[in-house]
Amino acid sequence: MATTKPYRVLLYYMYTTIENPEEFAAEHLAFCNSLELKGRILVAKEGINGTCSGTVEQTEKYMEAMNNDPRFDGIVFKIDEADGHAFKKMHVRPRPELVTLRLEDDINPHEITGKYLEPKDFYEAMKQEDTVIIDARNDYEFDLGHFKGAIKPDIESFRELPDWIRENKEVLEGKKILTYCTGGIRCEKFSGWLVREGYEDVSQLHGGIVTYGKDPEVQGELWDGQCYVFDERIAVPVNQKEHVIVGKDHFTGEPCERYVNCANPECNKKILCSEENEAKYLRACSHECRVSPRNRYVIQHELTEEQVAAALEKIEAGK
């Protein structure tokens, strides 16, 4: 690929057998550190799921090593150019699952999964009337961007999705089901679970939103907003033809695509808000979080009790 920026961000996953995840994680961390990569990689007996960043040379060496390991034969790397690292540190952690569904009877995507649709086929399928589009991501990811007409499951974590489906099964009955997520890993299991639950026509976006946005034919069309990513970039563009902002400021409801974490560490909720409202509301999602003695915004900006009281008074006066 033609390179114009000095760094790359790699997004990848693979369901494959890793006999000793703890040992692999320790060795892989040492290898990543030797290359001076930064990122977050999860390892389980069922495979690997990672995002990491580095220079073009560093990421080339990493991909070469992964491709030379027979366990990762056929692994696909989604590559974004970047001006610098997308992470502060390098973590490689062993986990019981790559994506946390916590099913009593786990899904093996090698044995059961939904039909793979390439971006063009997914685009065409979304336009059909007898189709329902399920976003397999969390609520805050959906709020920043999603496919037109997609259903937003009211969930805060992936493991809540099966229960949500069971409670809302009438939405799916008799429909062709399309599922999508950021890079595809969640849908490998989720679509397989849907098939096992008895839904007959289940498809998934192959390669996820990231691949859809880079596809030269569809160019991200039918996507509104941006795609939430789990690194310091927070959001990446998808639709190359038009940019429709769907995110709404937590405080005013105005169009917004800027995520911050609530300043109360005991809450830490992700909220969309402008820089102006971050300052006005002390980066807190509620009054309770604003007056928290551990409010990070107050501590970081060394605000006095008088300044906090004045800010609270101003908020109250504006109601």
Swiss-Prot record:
Gene name for this UniProt entry: trhO
UniProt GO molecular function: oxidoreductase activity, acting on paired donors, with incorporation or reduction of molecular oxygen
Ranges of residues in domain Rhodanese: 127-221
Keyword Membrane: no
Keywords: Oxidoreductase, tRNA processing
Protein name: tRNA uridine(34) hydroxylase
Gene Ontology BP, a term: tRNA modification
Source organism of this protein record: Bacillus thuringiensis (strain Al Hakam)
Coiled-coil segments: none
Catalytic residues identified in the record: C181 (cysteine persulfide intermediate)
Family: Belongs to the TrhO family.
Domain of life of the source: Bacteria
A Pfam family matched in the record: Rhodanese_C
EC number: 1.14.-.-
Cross-referenced CDD domains: RHOD_YceA
Lineage of the species this protein comes from: Bacteria, Bacillati, Bacillota, Bacilli, Bacillales
Catalytic activity from the UniProt record: uridine(34) in tRNA + AH2 + O2 = 5-hydroxyuridine(34) in tRNA + A + H2O
